[in-house]
């Protein structure tokens, strides 16, 4: 029964049920809220409406051909299912769940023929007598055709295969997969170990790995038929070597763990958890990680799949190498690690499915960080940065490259020959630690040498489909191993992206993807200490130190020379003795312009109005052989003559115009000439010297004594009445046009009258 009626409880129930549950079971789960006899009918109706809204927001109702209605989770919430939700529910309290099977029922085999099993794309018939019902009491009897049609997927009859939903939930993988009640008897599970092996896409692990476990745990069981025969039927030249035999610590058969029902069997959880611990203790022997990495509950592969010791990598890589070449994929080549610390393992019994949402939110910043680093590593043409922790070696690169065939890591002196299988470096995605922890795993050199293999795909971190669909290009591996605690320092020290231009050291040869997979180390302190250089391997194999362009790291604040700074300060303050002293030390300072206002020494002297300083500067420039431009313009277009006119320094104006021949017709950025800045206190000689126009009063003249005669007042009223303000040019032209029209009409009338008088 449900503990509350909420959106979270409904979504949690659907996720635990595998994303698909019968309508009757869903109503029965929330029966205490929908049919509470102690609640009024109005409240019950309100609860029903609210429940319908909850269901419609996250799921849809679909009907099978037999009329059974199922509530199916929408695709946008499929990421919440994880590894638990993709598995089928097991029997609860001994009740079979045969009615929930949607894949086609197997046809009844003829006498003397075994069951046809479809594993790994090959069909085999195991010869043997048909067991009688007395010999195997738990064997399923043939059901009627109605029950078989009820268990089939609707898409099988139309398209010949199950729909995407059934394939994701693992209900249409193979026609010979037994129902959950077939797995209750240990004898049946021992006789058919290959049937108990789930699909690789559902459980996140290859099916043959689970079959190997079942063969080890089951006493006296028939060895699995699939690995040698199925691979030979698929066209593989060699058969995969089996895992090294180990004594089975438990004499119980392996049962298929499912998490699709709302309540799991406690005994089944304990047994599965115990077998997991024993298997990890025997095979992996991996210590608990110091920093718990966030887990993606919806991904097929666990986040710590890179954490592999040598023996596991050897066994899995050997078996993966014998798989048929067309079946090679990213999921088949990367092994799965069963770690006790992984939250996605069903034995831990997570409290709620919504931890996947929390993990998704916690990984949001990391995905953005990895995406930015991948984008920066793709666009930049430089090689690895210098290694942190070796400051005494100076500019020592992380990978000292003599050729593309052999790479050497100076951190732990790990040699990576080209013929070896890829070396996987575990990458802890924890946020709480400041120091990154790395585990380097040596691999066997000749594990893949005797079998031709496709190139190993480039590693990339899986993210949800909605996030990965935004970018059209493939992400390259990240250039850093974790988020640094000081993000601001990391962002400041990062090199800005450059345009994709050919490097000066030559075009870099594309390395073999299957040669080595090494995650580069990065540290914010090391990057900040050496931001202007990088090591780039050239064509001949030697590494070269290529400095970056200084323009990319130029600060927006341009530092001034000490003498230039003092020159500007002394000119602005009017300290002419210090100005002349600096001038004789460096005469070129007279041509220096202020970076803010664009003023030169002539501008500052004209602004202050010091005539003696101007004469000394001009004479000193003539002696030093420096040609002063008296018409130089500032940032606002002012010449020294403009500034002298603005401040009313008549002596400086006369010296600039008469002796230095400064031009008086230059306009500034406002379009004004120097004489337009003169005030009324300036003499007429200065006005004429600056070329002011003649014949017009420069300043308006008003009569001191105003006339009070009535005739003058009436005349002024008439003038003011006739002068009106027009709102637009069209109105003004319209009035003028009317005047012209009336005048022309008056002339026509007048001439006609004259003609009439003349005719009389």
Curated annotation (Swiss-Prot):
Record field: compositional bias (Basic and acidic residues): 191-203
Sites bearing Phosphoserine, chain numbering: 132, 239, 728
Domain of life assignment: Eukaryota
Family annotation (InterPro entries): Ankyrin_rpt, Ankyrin_rpt-contain_sf
Phosphoprotein keyword on record: yes
Bias type Low complexity, positions: 379-394
Residue ranges, compositional bias (Pro residues): 238-250
ANK repeats: 597-626, 636-666
PROSITE patterns (UniProt xref): ANK_REP_REGION, ANK_REPEAT
Gene3D superfamilies: Ankyrin repeat-containing domain (1.25.40.20)
Biased composition (Basic residues): 460-473, 492-503
Region (Disordered): 82-152, 171-268, 370-396, 445-512
Listed Pfam families: Ank_2
Keywords in alphabetical order: ANK repeat, Phosphoprotein, Repeat
The family this protein is said to belong to: Belongs to the SOWAH family.
Name the UniProt record assigns to this protein: Ankyrin repeat domain-containing protein SOWAHB
Taxonomic source organism: Mus musculus
